[in-house]
């Protein structure tokens, strides 16, 4: 199991200073406080020989391994693709935002005009209502006058007929 964790197959891990703040750090370093090593490329089970003894070709630099380089190339391509898609999405959102702002301004102007038209229509309706009420009152008065003449035997005066009616005997006598 320790063979799978040897540094020859994995890239060197970056140093993270926050791990020293973990509560288990004090326990781990209590037994050997003077021999703290941050080199995780070698297993503690191997002999502490020099690097020349391992340079017989069995140890490959993790930064130069083909798998690592291929992984980095794929990651770089994915990052470029992600950046391009994000830029495209942001540009699309920006143009859509500008379009919506223009539409909103046009709708606000249309709303303003509609409110003005509504106010004018309300004034016209009020004036027409007042005029209608005046006509209704006048009509009621005329009906009352008409009913007054219809109920009585009195015939309303008609000056034109009276002037031209030749059946009246005193027609010419009044002129003398």
Curated annotation (Swiss-Prot):
Tell me, which GO biological process terms does this entry list? DNA-templated transcription; regulation of transcription by RNA polymerase II
Q: Where is the signal peptide?
A: none
Q: Which gene encodes it?
A: zip-8
Q: Which family does it belong to?
A: Belongs to the bZIP family.
Q: Where is the composition biased (Basic residues)?
A: 81-90
Q: What is the designated name of this protein?
A: bZIP transcription factor 8
Alphabetically, the GO molecular function entries are: DNA-binding transcription factor activity, RNA polymerase II-specific; RNA polymerase II cis-regulatory region sequence-specific DNA binding
The biased composition feature labelled Low complexity covers 47-57
Q: Where is this region: Basic motif?
A: 67-92
Residue spans with biased composition (Basic and acidic residues)?
58-80, 91-101
Per the UniProt record, the lineage of the source organism begins with: Eukaryota, Metazoa, Ecdysozoa, Nematoda, Chromadorea
The annotated region (Leucine-zipper) lies at 100-107
Record InterPro entries:
bZIP, bZIP_sf, C/EBP
Annotated stretches, region: Disordered:
44-101
Location of the bZIP domain: 65-128
